[in-house]
Structure formats: C-alpha cells, structure tokens
C-alpha cells in the first residue's frame, strides 16, 4: 500500500477529527482528485509540440493525458476552433497518492528558490491550485530528451468545505505553506 494513503488513513484522519470535531466520519475531508494541466501555446505554429507535451505528462503522471482543444477561434492568437492547445490528466485513487508523494518528496525540493505555497492559492471551496514553471523537477523527465521547458498547473480537489480544513489536510501530507 502507498505511504501517503496509509498516512492519511492512520494519522491525518485522526488529526482532522481532533481539530474540527466532525460528527460523522464522512464529513472528514479527503483528496478527491489531482488534475495536471499543461497548456501548449506553441502548438498553434507547430503541431509536433503537442506530442512532446503528451509524452512528458505521460511520464510524470503514469497515465495517458487527454489532448485539450480550443473551444472558439481567436484571430489575434491565430487560433482556430478545435485546434490542439494543451493536454491534461486527472489522477484518482492510488495514482493520485503516488503522484502527491513524488511531488512532495522529490519534485518540490528540486524547485529553485521555493519557499512554500501561499494561502491565496485556495479557491474558497477547499480546492488548491498552483503552477510549476519546469517539468524537469520530476525525476521521470530526462533533461537531454526534452525539446523545451514547459510549465504545468496542478489542482488538488478536496472534499473540504473551507480553505482552513483543506490547508490542514494538505499540511498533513507535508505540503509546505509560508503564511
């Protein structure tokens, strides 16, 4: 079994219960899913770029991503409807905990000048979103084989009702916050 899943079941649930005194065990917040999105604006000019982004995201997540398409045409960006402009992957259950573990233990310590996350990254409903500027912080990415450095947005969706509950939950997984 995964370490972060065991950590949640054995320690974090107990700490959340003590802190917020829930009446029902189903009220205790948990992580529902993690969504990783990689927008590839260069794909407008060169369609091969999207394949490289898909390969990178597949290596990082361990799951094949879905290619996202433009919803409408925008002339100033030379964008047409249904053009490939990015890719995203939704992780649930064991893959979600596996990714979170690799993110906290391996990837975040490799980010340059990283002090922690801001409280402002919460959306008011308990979900947490942040961005990484480089995909090379993940050990699965071979630096010599990438064509360009790409960033990504990572959203952690929780069942928490408030940002305070969500922050307490994510702090239990050792996600660093500086506020």
Swiss-Prot record:
Pfam families: Ribosomal_L5, Ribosomal_L5_C. InterPro entries: Ribosomal_uL5, Ribosomal_uL5_bac-type, Ribosomal_uL5_C, Ribosomal_uL5_CS, Ribosomal_uL5_dom_sf, Ribosomal_uL5_N. One of its GO terms (molecular function) is structural constituent of ribosome. The keyword Glycosyltransferase does not apply. Disulfide bonds: none annotated. It comes from the Bacteria. Keywords: Ribonucleoprotein, Ribosomal protein, RNA-binding, rRNA-binding, tRNA-binding. One of its GO terms (biological process) is translation. GO terms for cellular component: ribonucleoprotein complex; ribosome. Part of the 50S ribosomal subunit; part of the 5S rRNA/L5/L18/L25 subcomplex. Contacts the 5S rRNA and the P site tRNA. Forms a bridge to the 30S subunit in the 70S ribosome. This is one of the proteins that bind and probably mediate the attachment of the 5S RNA into the large ribosomal subunit, where it forms part of the central protuberance. In the 70S ribosome it contacts protein S13 of the 30S subunit (bridge B1b), connecting the 2 subunits; this bridge is implicated in subunit movement. Contacts the P site tRNA; the 5S rRNA and some of its associated proteins might help stabilize positioning of ribosome-bound tRNAs. Belongs to the universal ribosomal protein uL5 family. This is Large ribosomal subunit protein uL5. It comes from Rickettsia akari (strain Hartford).
